[in-house]
Amino acid sequence: SGPSMTRRALFGPKVAPLIQAASLTLALLLFLAACGPKGSYENVGPEELYEALAAGALVVDVRTPGEFAQGHVPGAINLPVEEVARWADRIPKDRPVYLYCRSGNRSRKAAEYLARKGYTNLYNVEGGVLAIARAGYPLVR
């Protein structure tokens, strides 16, 4: 049948469907890897935040300067989420970064943005300052 032999002719009727299935699976995995986020983040609670703080993690409060002044995690730096595009490149990629806000929504948005930029060592504090205060952890002014 010449140069245009089919897979079925080359490998027999039982092997051809397996090759086809393997090819489709590989194509799907490559597609998902290419379309997925470059980085990732994990949701954590106040306890994990304060353990990481003691271990030297970078803690970023993404609230407004006014909110930050009313009380923040000791050692946190204030980088408002509205300005994430300006400050994102200054955050080290090789160090754990913990993000929080009032309730966890703005910090989640910042974490998603940084993850798209390739950050993988990211943690979003679920519940934010509200959860931190409820759990009895200290805030400073």
Language model regions located:
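Rhodanese-like catalytic fold shared by cysteine-dependent sulfurtransferases
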Residues: R7-F11, Q20, L24-T25, L29-A57, ...
